[in-house]
Design a protein with these regions (language model features):
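Conserved N-terminal catalytic core of the sugar/cofactor nucleotidyltransferase
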Residues: 2-5, 31-100, 195
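Conserved beta-strand segments of alpha/beta enzyme cores
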Residues: 24, 72-74, 149, 216-218
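N-terminal nucleotide-binding beta1-loop-alpha1 segment
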Residues: 1-19
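Short catalytic helix/loop segments, enriched in acidic residues and glycine
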Residues: 20-35
Length: 244
């Protein structure tokens, strides 16, 4: 198993903290986001990591290549990171993702390492880390059936307050089998971009595939674990209170 980390974004809402560095280089309690994530992956047995870089990509590439010489670190460039979204960053790593089962992670997260281990050790070939809805959650939600199969993806514009107790937030960490990636997901992403462009989210394709029954995706609950997604300086302050 390998990991793909999406780290091309600008992180403009973090202000001066990302003036000269990629978003994932921001420290949380003295540890950079990207260092925390790579160390957790290494402790979980992952040795090959593909990082998709964009904003301040050369600085990030040089930093990681020098720091993690004991690992198989590979880099993919998104030269148009400022006019595309993460669906395109993911697609740029498609040749690597055809080689092995893959963990897909976004680089602006702090998580408990046990969340990664639960995902890796799950017998499900294709799975997503999810967390019961909380008021601070933003972005895509999912619903699940009694067996923790994800039954729908719900974009923010389609939220219904009365249904919030049924919602789970996607943590933005997934496990995909090589077969699913090669036979289904990557071709679907390519077709989606040809039809609708490159400025969208990879979860939109998962949404459509789930609705049409093209994927069986298991939800792995992060209930009881600490995690946070960092988009703003306010998020950073919260993250520093809840993680070591």
């Amino acid at each position: 198993m390998q990991a793909v980390i999406l780290a091309a974004g600008m992180g403009s809402r973090l202000g001066n903290l990302t003036e000269n560095d990629a978003k994932c280089m921001v420290p949380v309690n003295g540890v950079r986001l990207i260092d925390r994530m790579i160390c957790q992956l290494r402790q979980s047995g992952i040795r090959r990591i593909i990082v998709v870089v964009g904003y301040e990509g050369d600085r990030l590439r040089n930093y990681l290549a020098n720091r993690y010489q004991d690992m198989d670190m590979q880099f993919v460039d998104n030269p148009i990171f400022d006019t595309t979204n993460n669906i395109y960053s993911l697609w740029l790593a498609n040749e690597w993702m055809r080689l092995d089962d893959t963990l897909l992670l976004e680089s602006d997260l702090v998580i408990d390492i046990d969340m990664l281990r639960d995902l890796i050790e799950s017998p499900a070939e294709n799975a997503a880390l999810v967390s019961p809805y909380e008021t601070w959650n933003d972005g895509t939600m999912v619903t699940m059936d009694a067996d923790n199969n994800i039954t729908s993806f719900i974009p923010k514009k389609n939220f219904h307050k009365e249904d919030c107790p049924k919602y789970y937030k996607t943590v933005n960490i997934y496990k995909f089998s090589r077969k699913f990636l090669t036979d289904s997901y990557l071709p679907s992403i390519n077709a989606y971009m040809e039809a609708k462009g490159r400025n969208d989210y990879y979860e939109q394709v998962l949404c459509e595939m789930t609705a049409s029954g093209q994927i069986s995706l298991k939800g792995i609950s992060a209930l009881g674990h600490r995690w946070y997604e960092i988009d703003t300086v306010e998020d950073l302050a919260v993250a520093e209170r809840i993680v070591d």
